[in-house]
Amino acid sequence: MNIWIRGGTSDANNISKEIKRNFKDSFLILTTTTDFGGKIAENFADLVISEKMTYDNLKKTLLDKKIDVFIDATHPFATHASETGIKISKELNIPYIRYERPSEKFKNAFYVENYEEAAKLALKISKKNIFYMSGIKNLKNVSEIIPIEKLIVRILPTSVPEALKILPSKNIVAMQGVFSENLNKELIIDYNCDVIITKDSGKSGGLYEKVSGATLAGAKPIIIKRPEINYPLKFEKIVEIVNYLKNV
């Protein structure tokens, strides 16, 4: 069985590990969008492709590799990747499986639909600084709403050059996560923040530690909801994927 796993997440690596354990003769191709993710993925797959693939390139590769099953284990907010995977799988008549990391609701958090709404709400309820913990991608948009002097951001070290175009270095925390509850708490306190902005990235994205750390620091968590996508087939447990593959 030739299996394509679209990843770049720890979820994808864990899925690959379990598939190889249960299906010794399977051929696993795991994709990531960065070389860093690719190096990690090499431990779990037969072939790793570390590049952003165009629609046509992805379609051709799926055909060339004679893929039997397409597993989407991308980040919950990687909507374009998921929608592309669904469309191509349908065109090629390849079974599509979505692994969706479980979501958890927090009673003390504010939930919003998008980054603009999050930034506006944060500005409204904050009397101190605002800690943005949702990556580099939407930082520019958020910085156009929240005054730069109030905005603290935590990003990957590789994103620092881009962040410096938006914020001064004293407002940038460059670290590779996932982070503990205590570290989150201490950072929020040290940077004098009373609100955090994050997204519903689930347990493997460190959401619980962010929210609990914020609560201990006396800060209000604002969580951006996951986008809604109509997946053809979705599982929240890796064992469910393994069981499905046994019947393919």
From Swiss-Prot:
- Report the pathway entry: Cofactor biosynthesis; adenosylcobalamin biosynthesis; cob(II)yrinate a,c-diamide from sirohydrochlorin (anaerobic route): step 7/10
Keywords, alphabetical: Cobalamin biosynthesis, NAD, Oxidoreductase
- Look at the named UniProt entry and state the broad enzyme category this protein falls under: oxidoreductase
In the UniProt record, the signal sequence range is none
Which InterPro entries does this entry report, sorted A to Z? Precorrin-6x_reduct
Q: Provide the reaction this enzyme catalyses.
A: Co-precorrin-6B + NAD(+) = Co-precorrin-6A + NADH + H(+)
Entry EC no(s)? 1.3.1.106
What Pfam families does the record point to? CbiJ (PF02571)
Query: What is the similarity comment for this entry?
Result: Belongs to the precorrin-6x reductase family.
| Record-given protein name | Cobalt-precorrin-6A reductase
Q: Which organism is it from?
A: Methanococcus maripaludis (Methanococcus deltae)
